[in-house]
Amino acid sequence: PMTRFIAEGRAVLETARRTKQIFQIGTYGRFEQKTEMRKIIRAGFAKGREVRIIRRGGFKVGQWSGPIQIDPRPVPDYLDWEMYCGPSPLKPFHPPRFGGMHRGYWDYDGGGLTDMGQHHLDPLCFAMGKDDEHPVEITAHAPPAHPEVTGMWGWSRLAYADGVELILESGEWGKPHGLKEKGIGRGDLTEAERRQLDEIPDEDPLVGFGEAVKTRVQAGGNADTSHHSVCLMHLTNLAIRTGRTIKFDPEKEVAIGDEGANRLINQPMRAPWHL
């Protein structure tokens, strides 16, 4: 993922804006999305209609759930363990925390959800017209979370202020949510809305990184859009880890009335690292 927690992403976004540097996260599919649904939703025509997008599977939840009871081992001679841990807490070394299995520990990552999630959800953010918007209510169906090790989850529901819903479904745990996907297209609009839609000019094509460096036009998948897409995984993990529905303030980027969730939104960093 672009970041490990929400406040870290806000710092990246604000730094990119302040310095006017070209920034891009390379994810699968953003440049291949059709834009009709995006245009309809951004025009405000989703309000009052049922719009629900479901992303099924591909999150590698079981594959990247970390082992729990592993005895500490001596640090290998070739590894600077303190530097490897970086801003995360300095924990005793054991092999699963190093290399690919690091994804299964909250200290370093967010499990299979954040491992593959940004690839899957970044294009959906674009297609749904939510590149600059956060969901306001997040619910997850999962067993109680371990404090250090990522684990299984079944599904999450992320609802936006305009009523658009995104459902993430792992297919690896628990009962299904029972909800049906419902997109939105021209056929769902009134004649007057279709005329309004036709009057809205098409957006400029997304710019690749090389062209962005030359032209200084921000690339597709820039810090703003990537922060909003990675927050979908971070917010789902908040609901999983707390076991609660998260009411999220999309402007302040805080959980409303939930200090436990807010401690995960802005996590301490081990010195000398800081935001």
Where are these regions (language model features)?
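A contiguous active-site-proximal alpha/beta segment in oxidoreductase catalytic domains
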Residues: 3-80
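Structural recognition of the beta-strand scaffold that forms the well-ordered cores
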Residues: 4, 22-27, 49-53, 83-85, ...
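Non-transmembrane alpha-helical segments in soluble domains
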Residues: 13, 38, 42, 85, ...
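C-terminal helix-rich "cap/oligomerization" subdomain common to oxidoreductases
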Residues: 211-275
